[in-house]
Amino acid sequence: MDVSDLLDGLNDKQREAVAAPRSNLLVLAGAGSGKTRVLVHRIAWLLGVENCSPYSIMAVTFTNKAAAEMRHRIEQLIGTSQGGMWIGTFHGLAHRLLRAHHLDANLPQDFQILDSEDQMRLLKRLIKAMNLDEKQWPARQAMWYINGKKDEGLRPKHIESYGNPVEQTWLRIYQAYQEACDRAGLVDFAELLLRAHELWLNKPHILNHYRERFTNILVDEFQDTNNIQYAWIRMLAGESGKVIIVGDDDQSIYGWRGAQVENIQRFLNDFHGAQTIRLEQNYRSTNNILKAANALIANNNGRLGKELWTDGSDGEPISIYCAFNELDEARFVVNRIKVWMENGGALNDCAILYRSNAQSRVLEEALLQTSMPYRIYGGMRFFERQEIKDSLAYLRLIANRNDDAAFERVVNTPTRGIGDRTLDVVRQTARERQLTLWQTARVLLQEKALAGRAASALQRFTELVDSLAQETSEMPLHVQTDRVIKDSGLWLMYEQEKGEKGQARIENLEELVNATRQYSYQDEDEDLMPLQAFLSHAALEAGEGQADKWQDAVQLMTMHAAKGLEFRQVFIVGMEEGMFPSQMSLEEGGRLEEERRLAYVGVTRAMQKLTLTYAETRRLYGKEVYHRPSRFVGELPEECVEEVRLRASVSRPVNHQRMGTPVTQNDSGFALGQRVRHAKFGEGTIVNLEGSGDHSRLQVAFQGQGIKWLVAAYAKLETV
């Protein structure tokens, strides 16, 4: 392959990373620096220039979408399909490994993946069965505890309670949960990684096989790896494996779910002779945006250090707007987007970012009032929707009768007269006899241990599942799926729901059938039946959003959801102390720097225009709370920002009670355009009025002090 084909169009540092000798390497890649391109060209370099076998390459990404895109781009660059490479997420690759060695991993061949919702259901049932107070020992907290311990590589036997009764109870729940999973052949996401790691620990011959095979390992988004993922990669590499990691310590924003930004430094310490190449040239943002991002993140300690730059223009200054409250903030953002549209801009080039989902409501209302289409990015995902979960549960039960989570979900869906009392008997008997729920149901029916009506209903359910399994086993996957949805009664149940919601559910069921029709085997699924392969695919995809057809609509999302995206115009709202950085980060040591990294991620999403807004007052928990501007606003260099001021003519005032309705005077005794004097801020002009009586508020543009909102009853303003 011609070397120039792989290096043309790359900058000097990108070329250096692509053509680096085969050794351990950290590519410290700043936002918008073309890291994906570097990874793709590096793999193509290994194949086309170094003549490495595709079978020697493992590439780890953090989403299935990124893995599919990487494989596609490599094949486009090389010009041929490259089978044999392992490209996927940590969970996907661990799943592939466990499927190939299920006996050595002490798993049944048809083991099923338990997603977070099913994990929660199982834990709720176990906590109830253990006679624990579900409020004191919530299933969500138990899930967090168990997953956290697994991410650290810890089984119950490895955890010391030190006589702490709280820790002892969590350990009991962990133990009971794991025993239930083992009985039913269920593996949760954290278990995939832990068991894959244990497989290599306990079976050195298997580890050695993969060490000899995968001599070229590449890992993307390394700042987001947790302890077990780091240990997994380190064990696979051994002493002779060559590992390239790509990451950015300044974009590590998932510490709350176990990510260890320190893993980048651990890599430099643990992997012999590891070198560092910095990608600092940015191809996304203007110079002003990059200067602001650099200044912001420079306030964090312990960084590996890099300075983003561009050979593009300075662009517009970053706009900062001080709103009176969240209503004013939303109005301002919507009006700015209107101006963008009037100047020929597309709505889908505009993104509104916020720290938490709760902030979206007021923004949505403002957009609705102006009939401006919008989309909540990262909303309910396809495989997490109720009707899809129900359908998959039937399919899972057909594939594996011992799947307790699937049994629990559909045994009375649609309603068929199997009540909680009957299910409690089944659960209790299952615990006593150490059986799965399906096995227990069959035993109780054989022993005639259930009341007549309940027994009949349970009998009909087991016969339904058995008949569906038998009659559809030879059908194409999409025909099988359609048959199960119809014969189980799910289609009719949701069809009877009527209205837009019912129609949406039916459309989703149709889309599930389409998904099974379009599903194609991956090479790692060659030993699985079609249904088992698709169920594994669905479980692995459940954590990733299914994008709707892209429309011209404003994009609303949290800053976490925005990572990896870019927009021409970005608004970051709620830039207030206690909102962003969050109150929790201010109260807990070590969290503030991750909040600043999150702000850095938000700022670097903007390509052309960035606007930051904060409100002086915001209604929280039913009360109006006063906030100071976020420290992150104060950390931006003055030469890169501009404060947005209302026009001096005050020709278009706004009443925040009825957005868009002009108000020129209220019962406060003040009027728009009036000159006033304040003891602290000096002279200014009233540019806005809001409220009435004791709640009357004034927005005043002070000379040299900016725009301030004041409560008329307390401001002690003098007319000039």
Residue ranges and their predicted role:
Residues 1, 240, 562-579, 584-587, ...:
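Structural signature of nuclease core domains in nucleic-acid processing machines
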Residues 2-7, 39, 44-48, 227-329, ...:
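Conserved RecA-like helicase ATPase core segment
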Residues 3, 8-19, 23-28, 38-39, ...:
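Conserved helicase NTPase motor core
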Residues 3, 7-10, 15-28, 55, ...:
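Inter-lobe coupling/hinge region of RecA-like P-loop helicase motors
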Residues 34-35:
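Conserved glycine(s) of the Walker
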Residues 53-64, 85, 220, 246, ...:
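Conserved RecA-like ASCE P-loop NTPase motor core of nucleic-acid helicases/translocases
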Residues 56-145, 150, 157-162, 321, ...:
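Conserved P-loop NTPase-based nucleic-acid remodeling module centered on helicase motor cores
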Residues 159, 163, 346, 360-372, ...:
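Conserved helicase C-terminal RecA-like lobe
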